[in-house]
Amino acid sequence: DGKLCLVKGQGEETWALPGGFGEVGYSPTENILKEIQEETGYSARVIRLLAVFDTNRYQLQSRQYVKLVFECELLDGNFEKNQEISDLAFFEREKIPALSTKRNTEEQLNFLWEVYDGKRDLYCD
């Protein structure tokens, strides 16, 4: 429905896209579906890859990571607080709360909206 699912980590005041590290032996699609289930309690369907981000482009880290961001449709389930996530909410693009900039930046979300709206193809750093 065009709203963005964001989560708040335990002990954090800011929000981020759900996600996590990919595990060996899983495809990117399998990994994101696993992470969505673990973090949100929802089952989902991957629609398409929206972006590939180089984490060092946005915040220099001791290790370089590549983030794959997918558009997904949540199918069913219920959110319950867990050891990683304290809250989950769906936001309209004009009402995005303060972001956990170590995980997602406003610039990255703007790229995602451009792809979602069909204003550009897949975004890749």
What is each residue range found by the language model?
Residues C5, E23, P97:
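Nucleotide phosphate-binding site architecture
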